[in-house]
Design a protein with these regions (language model features):
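Short, charged/polar "capping" segments at the starts of alpha-helices
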Residues: 36-40, 107-109, 156
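Active-site-adjacent beta-strand anchor residues
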Residues: 7, 30-31, 74-75, 100-101, ...
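Short, conserved catalytic or adaptor-binding loops enriched in Gly and charged residues
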Residues: 51-56, 163-164
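NAD(P)+-binding Rossmann beta1-loop-alpha1 motif at the extreme N-terminus of oxidoreductases
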Residues: 1-53
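Rossmann-like NAD(P)(H) cofactor-binding subdomain of soluble oxidoreductases
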Residues: 54-137
Length: 170
């Protein structure tokens, strides 16, 4: 059975990770506003890594996540967080890990309120990517390092999330 992963905010970080999850054969769903969903459904996500030819990934796309996922990666802009998390039904992560990869700690309050007991603290390093188009990403680093921890989630759940990331080369 495939692991189901959702990416909330498929920009440079989220889009890169979505393609990596697809390459690891995970069921990958990107959650985004209507215009982005339409564009992704049409073009997919183009990812160029270290000057290699672009690879196009075609994740599932939706405006609202309502079915269960094992991992929800949150990578939206801070000013879009509140609207973005409304796109995810809390029941969808009732048995999953919510992993924000955002700067600062201000986002933890709204995430914990929306998804009580499901949020890990996450940090991303050794990663450099940027968008050259709406769904075109250039990645300059060969790998990414994600560190996560939680006082609320059981160790086994964090380890399961870690294995999902490792399989995707993260």
């Amino acid at each position: 059975m495939k692991t189901t992963v959702a990416v909330l905010g498929p920009g440079a970080v989220g889009g890169t990770f979505a393609v990596q999850f697809l390459n690891a054969d995970d069921r990958t769903i990107c959650v985004a506003p209507p215009a982005t969903v339409q564009l992704m459904a049409f073009s997919g996500i183009s990812l160029e890594t270290n000057g290699s030819p672009p690879h196009v990934g075609r994740p599932e796309v939706t405006e609202h996540l309502s079915f269960p996922v094992e991992l929800l990666l949150v990578s939206v802009r801070p000013d879009q967080l509140q609207d973005a998390i409304e796109r995810v039904d809390p029941a969808a992560v009732a048995e999953g890990v919510v992993l924000p990869l955002l700067n600062g700690l201000e986002h933890m309050g709204p995430l914990r309120e929306r998804f009580p007991g499901r949020v890990a603290a996450g940090a991303l390093s050794r990663f450099d990517a940027y968008r050259v188009g709406r769904m075109q990403i250039v990645r300059k680093t060969p790998m990414a390092l994600v560190t996560m921890g939680s006082d609320e989630l059981p160790r086994e759940e964090l380890e399961r999330a870690g294995r999902i990331l490792e399989r995707a080369g993260i």
